Amino acid sequence: MVVKIGIVKVGNIGTSVLIDMILDERADREDIDVRTISSGAKMGKNQMDDVLPKIDEYNPDVIIFISPDPGAKSPSSARETLSKKNIPTIVIGDGPGERAIGSMKEQGLGYIIVKADSMIGARREFLDATEMAVFNSDVLMVLSTTGVFRLIHKTLDKVIRDIDEDKLYSLPELVITAENAVDAADFKNPYAKSKAIAAYSIACQVSSMNVRACFKTKDYHVYIPLVSAAHEMMSAASKLAYEAREIEKSNDTVVRTAHRRNGSILYGTSLNDNKE
């Protein structure tokens, strides 16, 4: 069986950029087929009304819905629509999505909340396309190196495998913290693990600062330093994450979990260990 995965991206968080790619990093898995539909940067009602019906044309076996703040008005409306499709659906969101956990459970939806996938400093005077790209590259460094992406793909792989084998599946109810992220990263060096925990924890704090700057402060002289400081924090988190991986590389203990063609995992802990 080939499991058909429909991914609906509404708006953008850091995880959105690579959510489809982390399931099939070399584009050679034979057990899945993926289609991604995106609303682009916007996440209003018009975008929802246009995007959601298109996923039905693909007839997926499982749906992944990813957006900022799944509890916000438009994503909440989309969740309500998806919950009625009788298709296993997993919602992926950032930290504010924790407030929607209760309603997602009631709707029978799975969820993965990535607390370190923090809101960007979206003030026009500060955020241009270059700054946006730099911020997202820092976020991706944190999410990839601290173990977030590995934890996500392992979680989704289990659902895919259960559907493929026609087993009784359970949808994930996962809030990603520094601790369970670095456990998935499987650091061998304690200093590398400590740096990764620090990176994730700093990244989590970025969102509250940007929320204050973007929604709770009107004074230019207050909110510009706040968004700039928040981006500096994410940059610092990225550097710590990079340093954590460099420590593991220097000890030849970087853990790799590559997908085989059949979707199973090829596990290696030394650069020369990854042999089929």
UniProtKB/Swiss-Prot annotation:
It holds the Pfam family MTD. InterPro entries: MTD (IPR002844), MTD_sf (IPR036080). One of its GO terms (biological process) is methanogenesis, from carbon dioxide. It comes from the Archaea. Keywords: One-carbon metabolism, Oxidoreductase. Its EC number is 1.5.98.1. It is an enzyme of class 1 (oxidoreductase). GO terms for molecular function: ferredoxin hydrogenase activity; methylenetetrahydromethanopterin dehydrogenase activity. It catalyses: 5,10-methylenetetrahydromethanopterin + oxidized coenzyme F420-(gamma-L-Glu)(n) + 2 H(+) = 5,10-methenyl-5,6,7,8-tetrahydromethanopterin + reduced coenzyme F420-(gamma-L-Glu)(n). Catalyzes the oxidation of methylene-H(4)MPT to methenyl-H(4)MPT(+). Belongs to the MTD family. This is F420-dependent methylenetetrahydromethanopterin dehydrogenase. It comes from Methanosphaera stadtmanae (strain ATCC 43021 / DSM 3091 / JCM 11832 / MCB-3). The lineage of its organism: Archaea, Methanobacteriati, Methanobacteriota, Methanomada group, Methanobacteria.
